[in-house]
């Protein structure tokens, strides 16, 4: 909101400087973005009158003018196209100083003496008009200093308002704030009701009362829109960053800036029948005032006549019904449109207007009649004309209402940290226009006026007290809390530590949506019934995920498409399994891996990551809480995973996750041209383990035996290792599979497994007989249980 300081001070004028006023507004939550002077720095410029003009004898585009300053006549050479006898203009006399340190001196132009300069608005930095002289009113007092006449010792102040403070999008609203801040009376202009001098009306029918609870219209006949807008109004509009167009538009803009109520003037001759406030028909066409043709949607509120739409309600009028210089009769509109009906409509059509800006933030629903009378009075004063009666349609049941709010002094003290005297609380709230009634000692009932639609709770009133009292006066108290240390189970690993573990292994954390495309749901969980949203953000975010894999794989695609060849990502979040009546929301930890095993470097190769690399990462996660031995990896089946590279992860017989390569068919469908590995774990299972136990380091030597075993190809390495552990005795300290071989020299139905076993006794040296006996027991058990024999 941009406004003229002098305009504001015409309503309320505390005895403070501009700088202090600006600082106080900012401290009260009305942040001032900029302060711009109304004109440049100049002196020696007065109101002049052109008495006569003659053609320059030696220049086609120059005129020799006789100009009066009220006491003397001066010869001035001027090239402005609009210079003419009788015109009153800014006259810079000899010795004047214009913006940019430009001093006016006596000069000769093409041999003709010139004693001064006739000025445009741009030359005084008092506007943008640079195509001709600045034309002053016919009654401008000749000889008066132009700064005083145009009140140019002024500034435009721009305030950046938060969306909840739509009540301050007017001079009246800002004046209320300033009056409350400085405990100064606000002087409103006297707005008298305009009596009707004819009885012509246009019937008004509101077919969408919820969207338009109040609509006022008035016929004003015989206006003369060729009359210029008064300079004082043009200047106030300019300093509010609004361009002057014609008298009717300028007046509606002026009243909107002054009171905060948007208005619109229609050309009465272009209205067929009466006014209908209705929802648009789907695809209905309307050419707007800016020349843009829009195809209206059915959710758009329009002002229409009996044949066609005339305007988008609260946004912009139509071109064919807009007023022009030839308009003689107008229909003036002043209405209250519900915020919901206007919100977002301007943006959806690529528009943003002063009217939509206000309606989206809220307009006082009691203001429409006062604004109508104000605009009517100004129209009759400036353009002439005859006013008819006001037609008003009101749906009381759809008008907003604000319930009284109870305020407690104890709550004020609790939230602000200081005691404000009861009398001061009442004074501050009353200054805002709130009706305060004492209910008990330290408790009030506050009636909120219609212009403060942002106040509905006790905390809103306390916020107002803090603003008016002064945020800088509130005591500084640092928060205090008695924090007891929280016990942490030693056998439990928390999520932040798991995140750090995966980051240390080269992963990056991803955060994806819980909503996925139903098509992706079917790809990763074929046959399962998705949990669909009733009101999805978009069609491709309509299902709740049953796995974290779709989001991670989509993120992988995004990275691969941007030449990121080595991708390792993990995510923690909820998966949603089942339907509403039995919905299970389960925290999961998942990852996706693709690309080379190691980052590019001179000392390592470019081998691609494989199943066992990812399995090592998963084992690091499973072993984080000290319970790796409780988990087993068994061949598994999953519709999204490769049938030969899938591991089902179990703990005590419970399924806790899956690990594997993306199924080749799924990879082809998703356009993945390289192996992609994924894992997913139930977070609760991998976060709990066993208490660590201390084992004293033995001072005695280790004994190692390496065994090369032959086993059937369908026997898993883990089954072999389990049998070895069962028979290796209590002094086994390490068991490691270090080679697997299938091929030449081996039965095609068999495979070779090389394992290393290490024993160490805590209190003595083991001898070969003991180790050999244990080794024999291991081999015997392997042969009996798994048909695994020692390779010879």
UniProtKB/Swiss-Prot annotation:
State where the protein is found: Cytoplasm
PROSITE patterns in the record: B5, FDX_ACB, TRBD
Its catalytic activity? Answer: tRNA(Phe) + L-phenylalanine + ATP = L-phenylalanyl-tRNA(Phe) + AMP + diphosphate + H(+)
Name the GO terms of the biological process aspect.
phenylalanyl-tRNA aminoacylation
Q: Which GO terms describe its cellular component?
A: phenylalanine-tRNA ligase complex
Keyword Methyltransferase listed? no
Which EC numbers does the record give? 6.1.1.20
Q: Which residues form the FDX-ACB domain?
A: 698-791
Q: Where does Mg(2+) bind?
A: 454, 460, 463-464
Q: Which UniProt keywords apply?
A: Aminoacyl-tRNA synthetase, ATP-binding, Cytoplasm, Ligase, Magnesium, Metal-binding, Nucleotide-binding, Protein biosynthesis, RNA-binding, tRNA-binding
MF-aspect GO terms: ATP binding; magnesium ion binding; phenylalanine-tRNA ligase activity; tRNA binding
Cofactor detail note: Binds 2 magnesium ions per tetramer.
Which residue range or ranges hold the tRNA-binding domain? Answer: 39-147
EC class, as a word, reads ligase
Under the heading SMART domains, the entry gives: B3_4, B5, FDX-ACB
Q: How does it assemble?
A: Tetramer of two alpha and two beta subunits.
Quote the PANTHER family the UniProt record gives: PHENYLALANINE--TRNA LIGASE BETA SUBUNIT, PHENYLALANYL-TRNA SYNTHETASE BETA CHAIN AND LEUCINE-RICH REPEAT-CONTAINING PROTEIN 47
UniProt protein name: Phenylalanine--tRNA ligase beta subunit
Which organism was this protein described from? Answer: Pseudomonas savastanoi pv. phaseolicola (strain 1448A / Race 6) (Pseudomonas syringae pv. phaseolicola (strain 1448A / Race 6))
Q: Which gene encodes it?
A: pheT
């Amino acid at each position: 909101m941009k406004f003229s300081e002098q305009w504001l001070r015409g309503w309320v004028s505390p005895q403070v400087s501009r700088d202090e006023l600006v600082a106080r507004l900012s401290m009260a939550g009305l942040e001032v973005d900029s302060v711009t002077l109304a004109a440049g720095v100049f002196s020696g410029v007065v109101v002049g009158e052109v008495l006569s003009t003659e053609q320059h004898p030696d220049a086609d585009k120059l005129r020799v003018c006789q100009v009066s300053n009220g006491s003397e006549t001066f010869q001035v050479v001027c090239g402005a196209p609009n210079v003419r006898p009788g015109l009153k203009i800014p006259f810079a006399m000899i010795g004047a100083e214009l913006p940019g340190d430009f001093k006016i001196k006596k000069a000769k132009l093409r041999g003709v003496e010139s004693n001064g300069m006739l000025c445009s608005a741009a030359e005084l930095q008092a506007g943008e008009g640079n195509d001709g002289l600045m034309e002053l009113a016919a009654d401008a007092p000749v000889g008066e200093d132009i700064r005083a006449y145009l009140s140019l010792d002024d500034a435009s102040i721009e305030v950046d308002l938060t969306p909840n403070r739509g009540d301050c999008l007017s001079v009246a609203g800002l004046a209320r704030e300033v009056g409350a801040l400085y405990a100064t009376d606000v002087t409103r202009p006297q707005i008298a009701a305009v009596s009707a001098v004819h009885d012509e009306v246009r019937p008004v029918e509101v077919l969408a009362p919820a969207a338009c609870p109040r609509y006022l219209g008035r016929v004003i006949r015989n206006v003369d829109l060729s009359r210029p807008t008064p300079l004082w109004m043009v200047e106030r509009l300019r300093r509010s960053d609004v361009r002057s167009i014609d008298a009717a538009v300028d007046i509606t803009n002026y009243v909107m800036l002054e009171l905060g109520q948007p208005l619109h003037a229609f050309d009465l001759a272009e209205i067929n029948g009466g006014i209908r406030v209705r929802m648009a028909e789907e695809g209905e066409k309307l050419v707007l005032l800016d020349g843009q043709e829009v195809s209206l949607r059915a959710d758009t509120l329009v002002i229409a006549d009996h044949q066609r739409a005339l305007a988008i309600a609260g946004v912009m009028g139509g071109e064919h019904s807009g007023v022009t210089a030839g308009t003689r009769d107008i229909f003036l509109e002043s209405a209250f449109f519900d915020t919901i009906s206007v919100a977002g409509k301007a943006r959806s059509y690529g528009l943003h207007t002063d009217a939509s800006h206000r309606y989206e933030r809220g307009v006082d629903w009691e203001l429409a009649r006062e604004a109508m009378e104000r605009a009517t009075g100004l129209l009759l004063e400036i353009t002439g004309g005859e006013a008819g009666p006001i037609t008003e349609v009101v749906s009381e049941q759809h008008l907003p209402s604000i319930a009284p709010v109870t305020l407690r002094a104890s709550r004020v003290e609790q939230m602000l940290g200081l005691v404000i005297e009861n009398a001061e609380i009442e004074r501050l709230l009353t200054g805002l226009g709130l009706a305060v009634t004492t209910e008990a000692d330290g408790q009030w009932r506050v009636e909120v006026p219609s212009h403060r639609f942002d106040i509905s709770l006790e905390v809103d009133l306390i916020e107002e007290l803090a603003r008016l009292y002064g945020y800088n006066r509130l005591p500084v108290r640092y928060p205090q809390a008695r924090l007891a240390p929280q016990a942490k189970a030693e056998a439990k690993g928390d999520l932040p530590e798991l995140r750090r573990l995966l980051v240390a292994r080269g992963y990056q954390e991803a955060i994806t949506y819980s909503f996925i495309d139903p098509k992706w749901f079917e790809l990763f969980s074929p046959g399962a019934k998705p949990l669909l949203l009733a009101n999805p953000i978009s069609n491709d975010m309509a299902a709740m995920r049953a796995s974290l894999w779709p989001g991670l794989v989509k993120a992988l695609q995004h990275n691969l498409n941007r030449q990121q060849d080595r991708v390792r990502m993990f995510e923690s979040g909820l998966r949603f399994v089942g339907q509403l009546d039995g919905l299970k929301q389960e925290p999961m930890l998942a990852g996706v891996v693709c690309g080379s095993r190691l980052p590019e470097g001179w000392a390592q190769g470019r081998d691609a990551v494989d199943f066992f690399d990812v399995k090592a990462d998963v084992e690091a996660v499973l072993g984080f809480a000290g319970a790796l031995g409780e988990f087993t990896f068994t061949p598994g089946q999953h519709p999204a995973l490769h049938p030969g590279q899938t591991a089902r992860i179990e703990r005590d017989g419970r399924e806790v996750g899956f690990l594997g390569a993306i199924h080749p068919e799924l990879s082809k469908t998703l356009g993945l041209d390289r192996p992609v590995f994924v894992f997913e774990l139930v977070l609760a299972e991998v976060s709990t383990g066993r208490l660590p136990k201390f084992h004293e380091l033995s001072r005695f030597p280790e004994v190692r035996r390496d065994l090369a075993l032959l086993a059937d190809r369908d026997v898993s390495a883990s089954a072999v290792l389990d049998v070895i552990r069962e028979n290796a005795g209590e002094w086994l300290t390490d068991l490691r599979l270090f080679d697997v071989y299938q091929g030449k020299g081996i039965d095609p139905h068999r495979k070779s497994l090389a394992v290393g076993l290490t024993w160490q006794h805590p209190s003595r040296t083991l001898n070969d007989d003991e180790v050999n006996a244990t080794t024999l027991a291991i081999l015997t058990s392997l042969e009996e249980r798994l048909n695994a024999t020692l390779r010879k």
